[in-house]
């Protein structure tokens, strides 16, 4: 809801796609800078307390931003500060929540658990954009802020009340900060499945997902629609992603994790390419539905592959590395913003999608065994087990 509402609001406020992209940059850059550290903290502290505290702070940030809008005091720099603070909190949510899921269900149930987590997250991307569009068309952006504040306050209370027991650490002296980070990075480098997964993750976040920042601009400038129909565009993507996440939760098997991840990534990039060249709203809508469906293959399998390839003791650290790779997205937001100013928002997304396709195909061509691999916890350091070896 916040992403859509702020994208539309900032574009109406400034008339510049570049500032819309800057909002996306500031929201994501804390994930790049802080996630490895937060992953280490998640391995050393009570994850339930960390998650509940994160949501409480997010609720407070949203209340302050909503009050600034209601009183008419809000300026662009307030929005930038608020988005940055939100980004810091979101960089905590990802490694902590996913590590907790892995702790709770174990390797055997991880596909179903992450699939359901993604399904609920993606369903919020159906309700959120529709709510954001409706609020902006009627009550204003403050309604989106106050609604978010209420939801995060509820989430915080639920997190603190979880019957979650933190994993018991093995006795012995703790290593230093940098030694702990290095341990997580060594595990990443030694496992080729994780390496390829992270390379594609960077590509998707730099060249794929920044298109979302341009949807309000493309909707207004190219498709000639208002906030409500712009919200429907993003809700359609969320609907596709929710449907695919549920299917993955019920049907995915370890032998297919890497194929779902790779082909989902490629199909998503093709779909946003089709969206970027769509001449009408009603052609753009199905393109985003397909894009959302495909994106779920990438988003769900991304965490599943990492969690099932990583020992529980260092899972937070490795998920922190994954979150940092996701945090490269701000650079994509800047690139797409600059290209949108120079060309147009649609042309910028077209160029980004084509580049993303090339850079996703490249590692798959270099390591074709990735598509034949099966992810099994506790495998050798290479992480590659081809179907013929099982």
Language-model segment annotations:
Residues 1-3, 26-40, 46-61, 78-137, ...:
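Substrate-agnostic recognition of the 12-TM MFS/MFS-like secondary transporter fold
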Residues 2-5, 9, 14-24, 115, ...:
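Small-residue hotspots at the loop-to-helix junctions and early N-terminal turns
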Residues 7-13, 66-71, 127-147, 221-222, ...:
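Transmembrane alpha-helix termini and helix-breaking/packing motifs in multi-pass membrane transporters
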Residues 14, 46, 68-69, 73, ...:
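Helix-breaking motifs and short loop linkers at transmembrane-helix boundaries and internal kinks
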Residues 21-23, 33-37, 44, 50, ...:
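C-terminal transmembrane bundle of multi-pass solute transporters/carriers
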Residues 76-87, 109-168, 211, 233-235, ...:
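Hydrophobic alpha-helical transmembrane segments
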Residues 99, 103, 145, 151-175, ...:
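Helix-loop junctions on the cytosolic side of multi-pass membrane transporters
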Residues 188-199:
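Membrane-interface helix starts
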């Amino acid at each position: 809801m916040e992403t859509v509402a702020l994208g539309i609001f900032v574009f109406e406020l400034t008339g510049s796609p570049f500032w819309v992209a800057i909002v996306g940059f500031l929201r994501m850059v804390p994930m790049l800078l802080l996630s490895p550290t937060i992953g280490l903290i998640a391995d050393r502290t009570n994850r339930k307390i960390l998650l509940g505290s994160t949501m409480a702070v997010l609720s407070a940030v949203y209340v302050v931003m909503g009050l600034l809008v209601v009183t008419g005091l809000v300026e662009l720099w307030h929005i930038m500060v608020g988005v940055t603070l939100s980004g810091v909190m979101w960089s905590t949510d990802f490694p902590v929540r996913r590590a907790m899921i892995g702790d709770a269900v174990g390797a055997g149930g991880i596909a179903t658990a992450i699939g359901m987590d993604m399904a609920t997250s993606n369903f919020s991307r159906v309700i959120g954009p529709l709510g954001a569009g409706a609020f902006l068309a009627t009550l204003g952006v403050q309604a989106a802020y106050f609604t978010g504040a209420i939801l995060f306050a509820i989430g915080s209370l639920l997190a603190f009340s979880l019957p979650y027991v933190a994993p018991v650490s093995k006795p012995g002296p703790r290593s230093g900060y940098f030694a702990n980070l290095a341990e997580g990075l060594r595990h990443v480098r030694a496992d080729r499945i994780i390496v390829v997964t992270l390379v594609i993750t960077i590509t998707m976040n730099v060249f794929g997902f920044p298109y979302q920042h341009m949807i309000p601009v493309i909707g207004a400038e190219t498709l000639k629609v208002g906030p409500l129909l712009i919200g429907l565009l993003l809700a359609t993507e969320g609907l596709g992603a929710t449907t695919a996440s549920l299917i993955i939760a019920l049907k995915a098997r370890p032998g297919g994790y890497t194929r779902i991840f790779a082909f989902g990534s490629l199909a998503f990039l093709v779909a946003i390419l089709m969206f970027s060249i769509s001449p009408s709203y009603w052609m753009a809508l199905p393109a985003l539905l397909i894009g959302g469906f495909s994106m779920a293959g990438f988003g769900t399998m991304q965490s599943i592959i990492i969690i099932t390839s990583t020992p529980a003791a260092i899972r937070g650290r490795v998920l922190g590395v994954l979150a940092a790779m996701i945090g490269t997205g701000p650079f994509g937001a800047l690139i797409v913003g600059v290209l949108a100013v120079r060309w147009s928002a649609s042309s910028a997304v077209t160029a980004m999608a084509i580049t993303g396709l090339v850079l996703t195909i490249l590692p798959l061509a270099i390591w074709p065994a990735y598509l034949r691999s099966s992810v099994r916890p506790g495998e050798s350091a290479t992480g590659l087990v081809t179907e013929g070896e099982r």
